[in-house]
């Protein structure tokens, strides 16, 4: 959903896609970690990166606390970026070089980042567009939601807590007609990295288990990105043929009752199928794509003083997805399930 690629790796079959401060790297390099990961999981997210003040110190600290290191192979002129094993044996890279670090200004000596070293702009891409293309108005990655096996949510929450000093900011326990989901939302000390961790809430396999079966293991369920104008972003995404989830019209009939004085144009929300949550003066707008990379999907979100995750929409969305599973035969409707007992 970002745009055409803006940069090509200097030595490898790797493309960089950028929008705002979002960077997606598509790796098609033969015999790479990414290709081996894809052979197991199919279309997937094989790595994420955290900005840290000192990558070497952060890496050594993580190893001392029990993390598993990854020994990558840097090519000529490339940065050797340390990484540890993360969710589902994906990687977490620790990056300590980026533009603007420590208040550095454009033109300052040494104000270069990882992408400046390893990538070159494609022909026709200007410097301003290369650094922060506007695209559909997406700004930053808001959160990265993980799906894990039942009973492993607390273990992964402790992983982020122990290695990176994350803390829990939200806990959810949502029940549908047949299945359920539990989730712990973790955040980094700076508040810029949010990672909700989901597991099945009941014995009956549901949406989380379907993901785990499809993905062949634990991993990132969806990537959420922010916008300062979600209405315009959704219009742009639809014009680009992005498939977004539908929301029944009945949802919008209750918006004014559910969130008095929300200040949004309900007809504009309805026309774009945008969801709304929160309360007066603390509103969150969100919409989800259909699955885009195997079982992985995207969320597009606008925060207006609300730091939640759309909790008020969770149950409605969960039940909608559960109904879809029933229609596809993944779950049996309650009557059918009861008839077999």
PLM-predicted stretches and their roles:
Residues 33-38, 95-96, 135, 204-212:
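ER-lumen resident redox/N-glycosylation machinery signature
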Residues 153-159, 220:
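A conserved active-site cap/scaffold subdomain adjacent to cofactor or substrate pockets
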Residues 6-7, 13-18, 23-28, 32-40, ...:
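Basic, Lys/Arg-rich alpha-helical nucleic-acid-recognition elements, primarily the DNA-binding modules
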Residues 166:
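Phosphate-binding active sites in nucleotide-utilizing proteins
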Residues 225-228:
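Ordered core of a single globular domain
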Residues 217:
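Long C-terminal interaction/binding lobes of large macromolecular proteins
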Residues 18-28, 50-142, 146-148, 153, ...:
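Vicinal oxygen chelate
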Residues 1-5:
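Short, small-residue-biased leader/transition segments that mark boundaries at the very start
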